[in-house]
């Protein structure tokens, strides 16, 4: 017997219902007819039983119909639940992904928090170092150029003119140049203008320069070396006021005058070219500054020779310009050549050697060549240590070696020994202490990049001590000079009073 579908069952059941209903009606009609004609009781009982059976069949058919409807409802509910289960599976998978992403973000946040805490410590250290820088600037305006990396790396003509105007004997550089000599009145005026400018009194310095310039042009004409010198001085004052356009115009005018009057290959022309390159560098015009710097280099090589220290200074300037343009191959070549000149002519202990190594290491850092940069930084610090304490051995270690040992033993039970017990090694940086302090900070930053936070903090702490000691020493020196000056004035006044009394007593 084949299995019938639900629809067939329902259809057949309905047909049976109709047939049974018709049969019941017929039996009722017969029973009524029998009752009316008073048939015998057996037939009536039989019909009654048949009616009961038919009614039972009707009831069962109705139950079957209700059961079928219930089964249909159950099937629909089952389908609905399957859909919900499928959706819940999808939501569960999405929640798992979200949980994994959240955990990754949480871990990254924890790492970022740790990194920010280290950066906060580093910034606090830098702020403490800056405090000493600012104090030193307020005490000595001449030292402000150290805080300006462009001025630091560009020894411009302001410094050169000061040397030329100094009453000391002329240098080898000056001996190789003939002809023009800066008059005494301009030397005095230059010193006076620099003094006013260093005090920020530009309202006095600028009119003073302009008046002197007018007087020179009236007496000597525009195309005169003295006029060019005065234009240079005024340009430097404008540069300090950030009036770069006016300063550039003055320097170009001075360059033209010096080229006409002194010759295109005169050192003064090289100095003006260098000043103009510095000015363009401050304005970010590195591409325009580079040919000027190269021309100044050619002049100095021709006049002084290729291995003169002033040539090395110009090479440093040129390297910085190329570095700001991303020409790292040329940067490395110029810095290396400058370093060779300094080491051969001035010796390995000259401050310019450490400064150039620091600059070259900075070039390596920008290229991601951290190992080479680290080597140079360590060379600078090792040399500074050897100058003060002698050769390196197991008991006489430079600061970077001590820092790395503290990093290695930071998880030991014993506490790290304070670096102060190793001695004030930073006293080794007597002339070039700013360079050594900068090297400490740079190597500390490199250690932080490598996750060596204990070593970084050791170097930063030492740099801060060096700054503080230099500041305290400067304060003591100034106080001593002030007391000495007051004592000299007091002694002079007493001597004058005694001389006056002797003259008075000597009169009849």
Curated annotation (Swiss-Prot):
Residues 156-175, 484-508 are annotated as: Disordered. The keyword Cytoplasm applies. One of its GO terms (biological process) is microtubule-based movement. Ubiquitous. Residues 493-508 have a biased composition (Basic and acidic residues). Its main location: cytoplasm. SUPFAM superfamilies: TPR-like. Keywords: Coiled coil, Cytoplasm, Cytoskeleton, Microtubule, Motor protein, Phosphoprotein, Repeat, TPR repeat. Residues 34-129 form a coiled coil. GO terms for molecular function: kinesin binding. It is found in: Cytoplasm, Cytoskeleton. GO terms for cellular component: cytoplasm; kinesin complex; microtubule. TPR repeats lie at residues 186-219, 228-261, 270-303, 312-345, 354-387, 437-470. The modification Phosphothreonine is found at residues 168, 477. The modification Phosphoserine is found at residues 480, 485. Belongs to the kinesin light chain family. The light chain is composed of three structural domains: a large globular N-terminal domain which may be involved in binding to kinesin heavy chains, a central alpha-helical coiled-coil domain that mediates the light chain dimerization; and a small globular C-terminal which may play a role in regulating mechanochemical activity or attachment of kinesin to membrane-bound organelles. Kinesin is a microtubule-associated force-producing protein that may play a role in organelle transport. The light chain may function in coupling of cargo to the heavy chain or in the modulation of its ATPase activity. Oligomeric complex composed of two heavy chains and two light chains. This is Kinesin light chain. The lineage of its organism: Eukaryota, Metazoa, Ecdysozoa, Arthropoda, Hexapoda.
